Amino acid sequence: MKNLTILGSTGSIGVSTLEIVAAHPEKFKIIALTAGENIDLLKEQIDAFAPQLVAVKNEELALKLEGMLSCRKTAVMYGVEGMIAAATASDTNMVVAAIVGAAGLLPTSAAIEAGKDIALANKETLVTAGRLIMDMVKTRGVKLYPVDSEHSAVFQSLQGHRKEDVRRIILTASGGPFLNLSGEKLAQVTVKDALNHPNWSMGQKITIDSASMMNKGLEVIEASWLFDMPAEKISVNIHPQSIIHSMVEYNDGCVMAQMGIPDMKAPIAYALTYPGRVPTGVKPLDLTTLSGLTFFNPDVVRFPALQLAYRAMKDGESMPTVMNAANEVAVAAFLSGRIKFTDIARSIEKTMDLHHPRSLSSIEDVIEIDQWGRERCSELLQSF
């Protein structure tokens, strides 16, 4: 029996995780849940899974939720303190880190410090504080399992093989909804257009990141930390069908690939049950029904965000933290209609140009640099 805390239970990953938990009650028990503002869905989850503790964004929402719970014995907390309490709950032995963005850093790092195994869906944790987090993982002796479909695919393709035999990691990308649009048309796309992903059902922020290809850039950085692999040994292939989720090429010329229908329940379940597997309800893959699988290199002129991620890795130190902070600010500005889609990468690059990388020796340093990046990007956007 695994006792779980889910950080971000009302988001796409959180909801899918709870579907797996509900299908296998003999394997999982929910100890704590956290959410932002969607307390109506959180109330349904409390009724279904009876957690000991839940945490929400602020005190106002916490009071409102308490009023909705009547005689439930679930404790309600709020803010960062509440998130950390959920992440470090004494009965929890695995934390599903599914909070979107840099907001997931503090509770995830607290969970690691408390000795909890991690199922990591929050890629920004490793993007912003990769060295610090991986050092904590080693020091505390915890297990960190990837939930992202691409990193799960790499993890599965590495099983039974030696790291020193790896020639390169190949992350696949669908290309998003704007794969074939010209640069001129990219400047005219709407929020509605950008949120219409062809293959995956995801939250708003990650869907926009997928459209800009920043999501793949973040995944390159995450893969570098997860698998201790330099950037030059991590490639990206556009694969519009999203059937092969990623590959590992070995020095003998063999390539191991993980395939499946695009459904996040599969990598979530693998992270929760490794090295075992459980039925997930994911539709079986029938290769005979596919017209073909195609692969090609990304267009970094039309989608410069991917190259910005490689630049951030090359610059190192605090630059990925600044890049991520600027991206979160720019995506929020696009979603609110304040900037054009093509302004996202432009504003990130300008923010990075203002930054001189410095070493990060603590999570507090990461938070300070993250704030710097947000402030600089916000200032830049005023002139767009």
Curated annotation (Swiss-Prot):
**Pfam families to which the protein is assigned, alphabetical:** DXP_redisom_C, DXP_reductoisom, DXPR_C
Q: Which InterPro entries match?
A: DXP_reductoisomerase (IPR003821), DXP_reductoisomerase_C (IPR013644), DXP_reductoisomerase_N (IPR013512), DXPR_C (IPR026877), DXPR_C_sf (IPR036169), NAD(P)-bd_dom_sf (IPR036291)
So where does 1-deoxy-D-xylulose 5-phosphate get bound?
Answer: K123, S149, E150, S174, H197, S210, N215, K216, E219
Which GO BP terms sit in this record? isopentenyl diphosphate biosynthetic process, methylerythritol 4-phosphate pathway involved in terpenoid biosynthetic process
**Domain of life according to the entry:** Bacteria
One Gene Ontology term of the molecular function aspect: NADPH binding
The record's PANTHER family line, in alphabetical order, gives: 1-DEOXY-D-XYLULOSE 5-PHOSPHATE REDUCTOISOMERASE (PTHR30525), 1-DEOXY-D-XYLULOSE 5-PHOSPHATE REDUCTOISOMERASE, CHLOROPLASTIC (PTHR30525:SF0)
Role summary? Catalyzes the NADPH-dependent rearrangement and reduction of 1-deoxy-D-xylulose-5-phosphate (DXP) to 2-C-methyl-D-erythritol 4-phosphate (MEP).
- What name has this protein been given in UniProt? 1-deoxy-D-xylulose 5-phosphate reductoisomerase
Query: Its encoding gene is what?
Result: dxr
